[in-house]
């Protein structure tokens, strides 16, 4: 029997039997894990087992299954509403569908915290969208699916500001094509410059295609609520 203490967030919850809950937790130490919480239906635990509450969770592993031993909140629930709430649900769904269990990535965990806190404070939709685009890129990197914004995918030549490019999922950017993106926009995105509406629009277009490729046909329900990507 192995016991661990984890910094965690609830990504998904499903009731199990009359008293327990099956949890999908995103943790700094172990990545995404599946965990059984006995007594999860009690009022005290139900108040904790919600999305957007930072948790400190003690778990034990028995026969390749994680069980919670103790759950505490480390802070109050993030105040997400409207666009911020739908965006939080969106990134939770992304983690749920794309991450393999038990694959820790502290950088992605930090990006998740930064994004959640950022969208909780953001007052403009454009600021929320920029945060989402950066989180999507962090997720793509964590999943080993990256591409260059600085080089043409097939020739390796540098992206030219005055040229136009097409994004090909699984490859990157190729010169010309039906759905053309200015090279200037690609270079701005590479420099993390999403301050111009046109750059942000191109980033949204690119990331939607890249994330769809990563999802492999799985549907993100939060998109129908808000359409953040």
From Swiss-Prot:
Signal peptide start and end residues: none
Cysteine pairings via disulfide bonds: none
GO cellular component terms given for this protein: bacterial nucleoid
Keyword Transcription: no
The keyword 4Fe-4S is assigned to this record: no
Family statement: Belongs to the RecO family.
Protein name, UniProt field: DNA repair protein RecO
Gene Ontology biological-process entries: DNA recombination; double-strand break repair
Pfam families: RecO_C, RecO_N
Keywords: DNA damage, DNA recombination, DNA repair
Organism superkingdom: Bacteria
Function: Involved in DNA repair and RecF pathway recombination.
InterPro entries: ARFGAP/RecO, DNA_rep/recomb_RecO_N, NA-bd_OB-fold, RecO, RecO_C
Record-linked SUPFAM superfamilies: ArfGap/RecO-like zinc finger, Nucleic acid-binding proteins
Gene name in the database record: recO
């Amino acid at each position: 029997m192995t016991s661990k203490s984890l910094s965690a967030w609830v990504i998904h919850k499903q009731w199990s039997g009359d008293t327990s809950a099956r949890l999908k937790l995103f943790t700094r130490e172990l990545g995404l894990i599946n965990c059984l919480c006995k007594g999860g239906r009690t009022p005290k635990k139900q108040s904790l087992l919600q999305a957007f509450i930072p948790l400190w969770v003690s778990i034990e592993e028995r026969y390749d299954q994680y069980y919670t031993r103790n759950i505490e909140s480390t802070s109050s629930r993030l105040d997400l509403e409207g666009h911020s709430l739908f965006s939080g649900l969106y990134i939770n769904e992304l983690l749920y569908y794309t991450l393999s269990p038990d694959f820790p990535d502290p950088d992605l965990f930090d990006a998740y915290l930064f994004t959640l806190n950022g969208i909780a404070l953001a007052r403009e939709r454009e600021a929320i969208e920029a945060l989402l685009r950066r989180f999507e890129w962090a997720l793509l990197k964590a999943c080993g699916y990256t591409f260059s914004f600085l080089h043409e995918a097939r020739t390796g030549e540098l992206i030219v500001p005055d040229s136009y490019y097409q994004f090909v999922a699984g490859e990157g950017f190729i010169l010309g094509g039906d759905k053309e993106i200015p090279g200037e926009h690609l270079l701005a995105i590479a420099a993390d410059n999403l301050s111009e509406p046109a750059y942000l629009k191109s980033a949204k277009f690119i990331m939607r295609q890249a994330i769809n490729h990563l999802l492999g046909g799985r549907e993100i329900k939060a998109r129908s609520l808000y359409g953040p990507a």
